[in-house]
């Protein structure tokens, strides 16, 4: 098939690679424009942009698709289908209608649960037991289109957003290749009206840990916000990111360090901190962290 690919971050890269490996003709790659990054604040291409150039593909990065010229340029590609995954721009109706088979979106949830910007984070933070990938026929609404294919996967007990992100990206790549191969036989299924939830964009204000909350909720918060933006607490007045944790046993005053291995009392129950990161430093497993900065039993976070 002649495919227009539309995606921007790391999550999208395996999908582009899978489409190329499957023999599809990539008419063009659309992604967000390069943006300043790093200490020098030099413009840096997005992950999809960089990989597309490696693959010898044409890259386009318009700041908007609302204008008639941008829409005409898109339509002129004569695509059979557009594959959209974490692109970052709203697609006007003229763009949605241009490819012969429309635009297919790869969404990282079991729709209609977790429509919106942060479905992976929200699934973990809510304590969902499973999530998945949906291949959706795009329409004007936010993740409201009918679903062509879906694949379900359990969320593992200590899984972080980062780890689940990588698993779902690989699943999405496999599922879109299957969807394109079976496109003539697939019947889009409208999403049910019941069970709709919205995955709001993560606000950094959600990242500070309140140790008076139950251990289960704090563990979900830490795993759901890892690696970005990273849940955090203060140790001896210094902000420290908490990147991995597990539920543990123990009781004490909320925020109290219960042993020499960073088991922390919560409002109910306790958690063990597994991986931490000081400001300006690399992330470390708890045992290595404690060698450089012992946190005595009885310390209050």
Swiss-Prot record:
Gene Ontology cellular component list: cytosol
Residues binding (6S)-5,6,7,8-tetrahydrofolate: 109-112
EC number(s) reported in the record: 2.1.2.9
Top-level class of the enzyme under EC nomenclature: transferase
Keywords, ordered alphabetically: Protein biosynthesis, Transferase
Catalytic activity: L-methionyl-tRNA(fMet) + (6R)-10-formyltetrahydrofolate = N-formyl-L-methionyl-tRNA(fMet) + (6S)-5,6,7,8-tetrahydrofolate + H(+)
InterPro entries registered for this protein in UniProt: Fmt, Formyl_trans_C, Formyl_transf_N, Formyl_transf_N_sf, Formyl_transferase-like_C_sf, GART_AS, Met-tRNA-FMT_C, Met-tRNA-FMT_N
Domain of life, per lineage: Bacteria
CDD domains tied to this protein: FMT_core_Met-tRNA-FMT_N (cd08646), Met_tRNA_FMT_C (cd08704)
GO terms for MF: methionyl-tRNA formyltransferase activity
Family, similarity comment: Belongs to the Fmt family.
HAMAP family according to UniProt: Formyl_trans
Biological role: Attaches a formyl group to the free amino group of methionyl-tRNA(fMet). The formyl group appears to play a dual role in the initiator identity of N-formylmethionyl-tRNA by promoting its recognition by IF2 and preventing the misappropriation of this tRNA by the elongation apparatus.
Protein's name in the database: Methionyl-tRNA formyltransferase
Organism of provenance: Ruegeria pomeroyi (strain ATCC 700808 / DSM 15171 / DSS-3)
